[in-house]
Regions:
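Glycine-rich, Arg-bearing micro-motifs that act as flexible, cationic patches
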Residues: 127-154
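Small/aliphatic-rich secondary-structure junction motif
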Residues: 11-73, 155
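General small-molecule cofactor/ligand-binding pocket signal
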Residues: 48-50, 104-108, 161-163
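A short acidic, glycine-rich active-site loop
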Residues: 69-87, 138
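Short, flexible loop segments at boundaries between secondary-structure elements
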Residues: 153-167
Length: 167
């Protein structure tokens, strides 16, 4: 059985001048991008936004954090992802207008926690920023079972900043 590396003092990533990975979804509040930009400005780092498309699977992961992906259903051609990518880029460009921060958008695939972890490892991110999942009447168990922030905090060593989207 493979032993999973645990959080430890020697694994703390320096924050100064290091990138942040930011999980985004289409139509998400600009609070997530703006909060990440504020932290990036404070630390002198850049931002790598990542959207993990759950309708696609990873074919190959590359050292720079990008992935080659394909539709979950191989018999169905899906070029809608290109439009989602363009929409996300536009959403982020509008949200970050006038902010002096360098950023890139990566279109990922599969489970968000795994995709963001791969991206963070690849770019040497100091932390991962995600928006809080909004509870819409679900049971507490369901809320925590699906929380990307919680999965990230439990399955990788970087700090996770969860941005509240409503209170």
């Amino acid at each position: 059985m493979r032993e999973i590396p645990q959080p430890a003092p020697h694994r703390i990533e320096p924050a100064a001048n290091r990138p942040l990975v930011v999980g985004v979804v289409p139509g998400q509040s600009s609070l997530v991008a703006l909060t990440a930009a504020t932290w990036a400005q404070a630390t002198g780092g850049s931002l790598y936004f990542g959207y993990a498309d759950p309708t696609r699977i990873v074919d190959q992961e590359f050292a720079d954090g990008t992935v080659r992906h394909s539709p979950l259903e191989p018999d169905r051609e899906d070029d809608d992802w290109r439009q989602r990518f363009d929409d996300l880029r536009k959403q982020l460009t509008e949200s970050l207008a006038g902010r002096p921060v360098t950023w890139e958008l990566r279109y990922l695939a599969g489970r968000a926690d795994r995709a963001l972890t791969h991206l963070a490892r690849a770019v040497g991110a100091s932390a991962i920023v995600v928006g809080a999942r909004q509870a819409r009447g679900e049971r507490v168990h369901d809320f925590f079972a699906e929380s990307v922030g919680l999965h990230l905090a439990r399955h990788q060593h970087r700090p996770v900043l969860v941005v509240p989207l409503s209170v």
